[in-house]
Amino acid sequence: MNKRSPHHAYLVRVQDIIDLSPNLRRLVLHSDELADYPHQFNGAHIKIFLARHGQSTPQLPQFSGHGFNWVEPDNKPIVRTYTIRDYDAKACTISIDFVKHGNSAPASAFAEQAQPGNMLGISSPGGPNPMLKTAARYLFAGDITALPAIESLLATIQTDACGDVVLLLPQVEDLPATLSLPAGMRLHTFYGDLSLVPALVKLVSTFAPLTCDDFAWIAGEATLVKPLRELLRTQWQLPPLRHYAVPYWRQGENEESYHAARHNFIEK
């Protein structure tokens, strides 16, 4: 078997479409090449490459030390960032969960209009490795965009783990019936929109502060992530190596317009 570069793009086909809730749709993606996919854990970041209008198949990038290279720059695809929900090496499939919000964004539009056989591209996985560090106590917090990663990570956490999971979801039906928590983990749910972020942050501030033996994993909309990261770093004095706090998106912006600000926030 030829050994691939650690950075590789895969052309995949929609194999199955599963509506998980009123606001989440899962696409199961297949390619024989995925038998050799460098998967290490669910919840890892990946790029998806979507064909432009009038195209049936997206152009895939070449990778260099400076990012993507495009053979035809004028025809490069729409690029978005998602997380791996599940990987099955035997079936050669990867599952990605998409938030459904109509045609207002290209990835959501693709997912809502998807048909078996539709093509897209995906990258090799990225992000911290490991994504989740062993800890005495955990804090998970996020909105519906972070839910697939949170559920994936909880599925692999040690059975004696303890801590808190705090979710902001559009409606109660978006809470997965498959969500499984160790007995020592407490679940806190808020149902509604971003106006509930202050109440969510207030709740988290009442928890016993995490220490250097603990770990926090936080993701979602920027106005949710920013105050929680401030709480972790300033009030709780939690070192950067003991938390992951990444804004996946910012209301009113797309991935291109938010890219620089997002990376500046992460790198602070």
Residue ranges, per PLM feature:
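Extended, composition-driven regions rather than compact fold-specific motifs
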Residues: 1-268
